[in-house]
């Protein structure tokens, strides 16, 4: 085709549909996309390099700011990586507490992804309904750790404090309220003729191409591949829970939407099971016995020399991790979120690499939107749940 007849269009970097600082230079034949060149790095913050100068516990503030829609998931994946290298084993109750927080984070992430997809397709009502439930989740986080979005939640070895009675009641209330909200949300979209026309056949990718790119998570399962890190490589006692892995068929925008909806139902089931297990165990256990990593209670710091020593050691970043290297991955809200850690036996990582699923999806994005309409490019990006903080890191 003669390029003289094509129009160059910038989608981003500050377009309201990009959900972050993305730029795509599109070649358009009318409203049809002929070619796309993505640009990355607008909010690259050199997290991996910064981590080489930080104590292990301080890196939580970096992982918090990758996929900020489900920050506790990122944090706990990092904590598990350090625990794996340091040989720290957690009590079952702590594992179950982590599962509750991780699945609440997954729901918060999925609901914002699917509701924003609705907004980009022209349906604003579902967003207004379901955001009330996101607020409930953030109130739970706030009760547990004092923060809502970038929570700094969790510690190497467990949690900074136990779930109090208010937090437990709020979790139970969310479990009681959310099914009706999710059902109403699905009724607005699942069989909506306009929404189906906008999403079915849009932004599709085959299972083979998805695997070649390195897709994982809901975007891979939407293409029909039954892969979930929680099942293939269980961590944090996920083997103790009964749940199914929803999969799609066509790998298009509609399938990605449906897979995330079904995953929220499964997450609710997992949280219910975890809460039953937590309530069956004695209260007060919320971290492993690892004084080198866990800050002692403040009243002990004022009265006991040993507690003061550990407090000083941790705050000054003098805790050392055994020499070695380890890779650990979790099923993040967007897919396999991996951490490759190399330690030279010092107080900071020698090298740290994050496997960021959004970065991988963005490489496939131009292929997925070629031949599509400009409006299809917007809903395709929404359905991939591309988060700039995770992609650029």
From Swiss-Prot:
Record key words, sorted: Cell inner membrane, Cell membrane, Membrane, NAD, Quinone, Translocase, Transport
GO cellular component, one term: plasma membrane
Annotated TM spans: none
InterPro entries: NADH_Q_OxRdtase_suD, NADH_UbQ_OxRdtase_49kDa_CS, NDH1_su_D/H, NiFe-Hase_large
Molecular function in Gene Ontology: NAD binding; NADH:ubiquinone reductase (non-electrogenic) activity; quinone binding
Localisation: Cell inner membrane
Pfam families: Complex1_49kDa (PF00346)
Catalytic function, reaction form: a quinone + NADH + 5 H(+)(in) = a quinol + NAD(+) + 4 H(+)(out)
E.C. number(s) listed in UniProt: 7.1.1.-
Broad class of enzyme this protein falls into: translocase
Topology class, membrane: Peripheral membrane protein
Known function: NDH-1 shuttles electrons from NADH, via FMN and iron-sulfur (Fe-S) centers, to quinones in the respiratory chain. The immediate electron acceptor for the enzyme in this species is believed to be a menaquinone. Couples the redox reaction to proton translocation (for every two electrons transferred, four hydrogen ions are translocated across the cytoplasmic membrane), and thus conserves the redox energy in a proton gradient.
NCBIfam families: PRK06075.1
Family, similarity comment: Belongs to the complex I 49 kDa subunit family.
Protein's name according to its UniProt entry: NADH-quinone oxidoreductase subunit D 2
Organism: Cytophaga hutchinsonii (strain ATCC 33406 / DSM 1761 / CIP 103989 / NBRC 15051 / NCIMB 9469 / D465)
């Amino acid at each position: 085709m003669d390029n003289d007849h094509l129009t160059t269009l910038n989608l981003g970097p500050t377009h309201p549909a990009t959900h972050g600082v993305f730029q795509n230079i599109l070649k358009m034949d009318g409203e049809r996309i002929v070619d796309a060149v993505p640009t990355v790095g607008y909010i690259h913050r050199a997290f991996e390099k910064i981590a080489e100068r930080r104590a292990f516990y301080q890196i939580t503030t970096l992982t918090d700011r990758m996929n900020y829609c489900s920050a506790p998931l990122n944090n706990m994946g990092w904590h598990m990586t350090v625990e794996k290298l340091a040989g720290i084993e957690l009590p079952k109750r702590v594992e179950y507490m982590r599962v509750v927080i991780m699945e609440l984070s997954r729901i918060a992430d999925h609901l914002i992804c699917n509701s924003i997809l609705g907004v980009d397709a022209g349906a604003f009502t579902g967003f207004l309904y379901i955001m009330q439930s996101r607020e409930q989740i953030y109130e739970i986080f706030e009760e547990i750790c004092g923060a809502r979005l970038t929570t700094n939640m969790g510690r190497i070895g467990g949690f900074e404090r136990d779930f109090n009675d208010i937090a437990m009641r709020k979790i139970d209330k969310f479990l009681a309220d959310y099914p009706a909200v999710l059902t109403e949300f699905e009724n607005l979209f699942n069989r909506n003729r306009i929404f189906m026309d906008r999403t079915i056949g849009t932004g599709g990718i085959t299972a083979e191409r998805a695997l070649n790119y390195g897709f994982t998570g809901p975007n891979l399962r939407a293409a029909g591949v039954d892969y979930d890190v929680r099942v293939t490589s269980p961590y944090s006692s996920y083997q103790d829970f009964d749940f199914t892995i929803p999969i799609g068929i066509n790998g298009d925008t509609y399938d990605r939407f449906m897979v995330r909806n079904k995953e929220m139902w499964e997450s609710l089931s997992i949280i219910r099971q975890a809460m039953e297990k937590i309530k069956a165990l004695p209260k007060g256990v919320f971290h492993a016995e690892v004084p080198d990593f866990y800050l002692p209670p403040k009243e002990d710091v004022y009265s006991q020399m040993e507690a003061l020593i550990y407090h000083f050691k941790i705050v000054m970043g003098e805790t050392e991790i055994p020499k070695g290297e380890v890779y650990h991955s979790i099923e993040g809200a967007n897919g396999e979120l991996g951490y490759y850690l190399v330690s030279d036996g010092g107080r900071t990582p020698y090298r740290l690499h994050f496997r960021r699923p959004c970065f991988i999806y963005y490489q496939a994005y131009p292929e997925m939107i070629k031949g599509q309409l400009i409006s299809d490019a917007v809903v395709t990006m929404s359905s991939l749940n591309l988060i700039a903080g995770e992609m650029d890191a």
